[in-house]
Amino acid sequence: VIVLDTNIILALLDKKDAHHKNAVGIIEDLGNERVYVLNTNLSEIYSVIARRCRERKYDCKEALGKLKELEANINIIWLENMQEIHAELADGVIESNGELNYNDVLLLKFVRDEEAKLITFDKQLKVENQRIRGGQA
């Protein structure tokens, strides 16, 4: 299982993103591999795109509409029963001294538990992902 972080999708959709070309290359390199996004990351993507549109005075409906269209080609993992793991996630944010946000801790927990591959541009997430895997990417 390959899981994409929020920043990969954002960079893919936003041609002005510093990582746009890298994101396109990553997706092209994956070819026909099935990739997944957690529903929590999807909600984060919607929020960031809406904010960027407002800041840049772009048409939010058009940009968000493109994201909704992209959903048809993304495998979304719908996490439920978050109440059961909330304390663990909150502790992860606290233990990282705020270096990781709640969604980051959730994403790391998922890739650890499911032995999934994480693709991200976030250096801190990469470091933490390697740490929890015992040095393996």
What are these regions (language model features)?
Residues 15, 39-43, 65-96:
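Acidic catalytic patch
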Residues 9, 42, 125-126:
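A generic structural signal for short hydrophobic patches within well-formed alpha-helices
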Residues 1-37, 52-65:
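Short, well-structured N-terminal submotif of metal-dependent ribonuclease cores
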